[in-house]
């Protein structure tokens, strides 16, 4: 998939609208707690500034439901962006109207203007054409660098592309290049590492990627649905009964297609209060047991399977990572993948958070900024924010 790149646009002295995803956590004072997504957009912003563009940044934050709400303001984001760029960031209190028009008209080459939260207008999520046209009138070129919002057909993601020449920013290009590699031309052997609580989040992903991979290792609470499909006692562990049939079918397809599937088979088990912690094999589970993390045997088996791989896509923590008692599986497999000689791509918000917490971020080829967007891309869907950027032929 080839996208029209920002490199192909003549940006000098042009008003360039950049859709970024600055949907970051804030503290009670409105200060940025985690600037991962802001940092990810810096290469595009810096390129535009260096090349003399007048940069107009547009983002959403949270879900203010189409109403102005101070706790979802981007003022704190502007402050953090100024610190990261060592540069003044101008701030407009809206994305449409006289104030933002005056601010845009006053921009000089190399200036950066961040507009207030676009989701303060309900027209954004409705993909309202008139609203998109109004915002488009502020600029001469549109750049989408918000991969993580590109599975939404919103006014500043998809609608705006009908009114301006549209290009991909560097983050968008990087995301699409790495994720396309996973579906089109991975180095083999190619393995998935899957965790998290729900199979339901990954049904389409599994259906699309099973024929493309050489194997997968499955941990997290989702593995209990696979064990139930094989008739095992899983105690009170999380299970999706309506997907037991799907899990059974997937395991059968994997066998037919000669794919290696490694299910976590021992667990860090506790009761509902997360007390009385012990290690148990799946075959020893009692009716009250709950598995909260993969056990040492599973960690060893996962490593033995993954050591063969050249490409790995990891989506989902392997245990209840936010509780230190149940973080060992994610930590050990994460550390193993961080030292892995092949290409590892990490996708999903919880997995990215775990990788950052373990301070392994820089060790991976790519940590995707997109949770839902990266999964939908890997499911084979054409994302509404990306389709207008694709070079035909």
Curated annotation (Swiss-Prot):
Protein name, per record: Phosphoglycerate kinase
PANTHER family registered for this protein in UniProt: PHOSPHOGLYCERATE KINASE, PHOSPHOGLYCERATE KINASE 1, CHLOROPLASTIC-RELATED
SUPFAM superfamilies xref list: Phosphoglycerate kinase
GO molecular-function terms, A-Z: ADP binding; ATP binding; phosphoglycerate kinase activity
Subunit description: Monomer.
Subcellular location: Cytoplasm
GO biological process, one term: gluconeogenesis
Lineage of the species this protein comes from: Bacteria, Pseudomonadati, Coprothermobacterota, Coprothermobacteria, Coprothermobacterales
HAMAP family: Phosphoglyc_kinase
């Amino acid at each position: 998939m080839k996208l029209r790149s920002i490199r192909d646009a003549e940006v000098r002295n042009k008003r360039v609208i950049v859709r970024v995803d600055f949907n970051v956590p804030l503290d009670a004072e409105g200060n940025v707690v985690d600037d991962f997504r802001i940092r990810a957009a810096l290469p595009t912003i810096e390129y535009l500034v260096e090349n003399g563009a007048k940069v107009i940044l547009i983002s959403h934050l949270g879900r203010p439901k189409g109403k102005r709400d101070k706790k979802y303001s981007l003022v704190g984001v502007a402050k953090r962006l100024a610190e990261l760029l060592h540069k003044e960031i101008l701030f407009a209190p809206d994305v449409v109207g006289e104030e933002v028009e005056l601010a845009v008209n006053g921009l000089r080459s190399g200036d950066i203007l961040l507009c207030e939260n676009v989701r303060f207008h309900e027209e954004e999520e409705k993909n309202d054409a008139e609203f998109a046209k109004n915002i488009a009138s502020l600029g001469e070129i549109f750049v989408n660098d918000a991969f993580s919002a590109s599975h939404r057909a919103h006014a500043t993601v998809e609608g705006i592309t009908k009114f301006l020449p549209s290009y991909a920013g560097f983050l968008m290009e990087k995301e699409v290049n790495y994720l396309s590699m996973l579906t089109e031309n991975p180095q083999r052997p190619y393995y998935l590492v899957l965790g998290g609580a729900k199979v339901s989040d990954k049904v389409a992903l599994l259906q699309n990627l099973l024929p493309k991979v050489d194997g997968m290792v499955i941990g997290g609470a989702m593995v209990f649905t696979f064990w139930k499909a094989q008739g095992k006692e899983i105690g009170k562990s999380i299970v999706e009964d309506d997907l037991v049939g799907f899990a059974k079918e997937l395991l059968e397809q994997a066998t037919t297609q000669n794919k290696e599937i490694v299910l976590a088979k021992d667990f860090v088990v506790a009761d509902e209060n997360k007390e009385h912690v012990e290690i148990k094999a799946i075959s020893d589970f009692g009716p009250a047991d709950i598995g909260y993390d993969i056990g040492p045997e599973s960690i060893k088996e996962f490593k033995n399977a993954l050591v063969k791989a050249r490409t790995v896509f990891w989506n989902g923590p392997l245990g209840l990572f936010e509780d230190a008692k149940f973080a060992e599986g994610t930590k050990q497999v994460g550390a193993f993948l961080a030292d892995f000689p092949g290409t590892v791509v990490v996708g999903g918000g919880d997995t990215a958070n775990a990788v950052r917490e373990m301070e392994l971020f820089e060790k991976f080829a790519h940590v995707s900024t997109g949770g839902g967007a990266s999964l939908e891309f890997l499911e084979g869907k054409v994302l509404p924010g990306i389709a207008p950027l694709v070079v035909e032929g």
